[in-house]
Amino acid sequence: FFFLPLAAAQATGAERDALQFNLIAGGIRAILLVGYMWLISCWSEIRRVFEYHGAEHKSIFTFEAGVDLTVEEARSFGRLHPRCGTSFLLIVVLLSIFLFAVADSLFADFVARPQTLLERFATHLSVLPLVSGLSFELLKLSGRKRNHPLTRLLIAPGLWLQRITTREPSDDQLEV
């Protein structure tokens, strides 16, 4: 998920244009993420895990609504939650495109040459904590402002992705 997209983008010859390079690498990263999630969702064992993931979201919604945490109450809530880790991963992938492009541009300005693949890998790895921290803050903000029309538009891709990583749980799973 990290080195392969960089190597693939490097192979396209886009290493001189930081934004183009990171759009290619980020696109590959997004395809790998969605493809991996879809592929593992085909396995029955993982499908069951995704049912528990849906139960977790229903439980969180029940708790946040301030109603009794019972199977009957939880059943009425949706399985797609705006502050899900699946959404977080998508935010990381998308935000990294732009923050990595900025880091690459600064590096190129500082050393006056394009980065090697290993230098780019090290640069991106060093910026990853910033990407993760900002992504987490955006995820928290999306939870607080989830009813705002712009927020609903921005969180939609993460909710769509959760259609892969969550399944409708059984009552036994909700009870856990």
Residue ranges and their predicted role:
Residues 69-91:
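Loop-to-transmembrane boundary segments
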Residues 1-30, 38, 42, 172-175:
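Conserved cytosolic headpiece of P-type ATPases
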Residues 13-17, 21, 79-83, 111-123:
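Juxtamembrane/transmembrane-helix boundary motifs in multi-pass membrane proteins
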Residues 84, 98-115, 119, 174-176:
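Long hydrophobic alpha-helices with heptad-repeat/coiled-coil character
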Residues 21, 25, 29, 33, ...:
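Pore-lining and gate-forming transmembrane alpha-helices of multi-pass membrane transport proteins
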Residues 164-176:
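Terminal membrane-proximal soluble interaction domains of membrane-associated proteins
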Residues 4-15, 36-74, 104-109, 135-160:
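Juxtamembrane helix-loop transition segments at the membrane interface in multi-pass membrane proteins
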